[in-house]
Amino acid sequence: LGVLLPICLLLFPLTALPLDGDQPADRPAERMQDDFITEQHPLFDPVKRCCDWPCNAGCVPCCF
C-alpha cells in the first residue's frame, strides 16, 4: 500500500480531476471583478477594507 499510493498519485494527479466550476477559486476573473465592484460601492471604506453598516449584497465584507 505504501508503494501503490505514490504510484497512483503520480499516474493520476488530483489536479487532473475536473473542477465543479461553482467555487470562487475556479473563477479568478469573476472574483477579481467582484472585488472591483465592492471597491466602487459607496458604503466601502478603503481604509478598513470593508463595508460600513448597513451592508447589502453589493458590498462585502461587512465591517463589524
Swiss-Prot record:
Cystine connections: 50-63, 51-59, 55-62
One Gene Ontology cellular component: extracellular region
Keyword field contains RNA-binding: no
Keyword entries, A-Z: Cleavage on pair of basic residues, Disulfide bond, Hydroxylation, Secreted, Signal, Toxin
PTM-bearing positions, type 4-hydroxyproline: 61
Tissue expr: Expressed by the venom duct.
Any one GO MF annotation of this record: ion channel inhibitor activity
Keyword Coiled coil part of the UniProt annotation: no
Propeptide position ranges: 17-49
Pfam family membership, one: Conotoxin
Signal peptide: 1-16
Location(s), subcellular: Secreted
Family (UniProt): Belongs to the conotoxin M superfamily.
Domain-related comment: The cysteine framework is III (CC-C-C-CC).
Protein name as annotated: Conotoxin Pu3.4
Annotated source species: Conus pulicarius
